[in-house]
Amino acid sequence: MSVMKRIMPTIAVFLIMALAFTVKAEASMGFSVNPSFPENQRSNSGFYDLRITPGQEQDIIVTVVNPTNTQIAVTVEAFTVSTARSGTVDYSNTRVNDETLPHLISDLITIAEPRVIIPAHSEEDVILKLTAPDESFDGILLGSLRFLREPTEDEIESAGAIMNRYAQAIAIRLSMNDRELDADFALGEITSQITNARASIVVDVRNPMARMARGVRAEARIFERDSNREIFYQSLDEVDFAPNSVFPLTMVDRAGYGLNPGIYRAEIMLEYEGQTWQFDQEFEIAPTQAARVNSQARNQNQQQAGLRANNDAINPLTWAMIGAGALVVVVAIVLIIRQKRKSEEILELQQRILAQQKR
């Protein structure tokens, strides 16, 4: 029997445990949402892809299912998607859109009951009324229907300081024609901010078109204007832009030196669908702004250091569990190796006996 065959039962146990954990994690959401697609649904995707006409009105129906033994409350929202700092399409309610956005999804969808009560082992239909714009538009409007489950009384009592929130989202895409729009980008404001307790420079890269732009390559450099010394560099290979959105391209002061006041120059390059966009723009960091950002970064770093110290103080149990798990793995490997050696010794002994018998 090979070593792999001996290990397979152990691997199977871990796979079963992982599968059980995944099922448990999905069940812990406490609810599910099932969209009902109308006749003007354009595709077989799992989200709403609706072809609409000017002034059209229709109902969108989503069934919320509660499979648990407890009554739950779910709040419903509709909003336009945006582009996250990570370079992905953000289906949460960040409200960061470009000035070219013609319509907010929240202005087109009315929710009669934004808070729905679903009894245990029951389901309820949520009805959202869609009213299309009076004027025609090219491209797409992309939004999200978010369903947020409120924590139950038991969850509130057992959560302590940390409260988990469970949400599910269904994308909604609205269009009036199949006209394809060319890609285009523009540069917006450049500011100094705080990102993950670090001073940073944020360049707003705009997608002013009513279309998605997936897999954009972006490269950014920041120079001191007078010395032309490069102080920041960032390269991203796969940026996804939501329609009519702003991507906050962020360069973080990872060394922790802070920002100096002065005049700087940003060079931004974008590549998409065989085209290249290049931007060169000066900006200033005022002394008061640099002082404020650096001070906030120091304060947040100190707070995080305190939290890490507290975590280290209560982590012996975690380390003990990790150590125990590692010990189990080591013992299993040792046993397998010993068993293999024993099998080899037995096989060698059998071969010797057979050889002697032949003589």
For each of these PLM feature ranges, what is it?
Residues 341-359:
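Cytoplasmic C-terminal tails of single-pass
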Residues 65-70, 81, 135, 206-212:
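Short solvent-exposed strand-capping/beta-turn motif centered on an Asx-Ser/Thr pair
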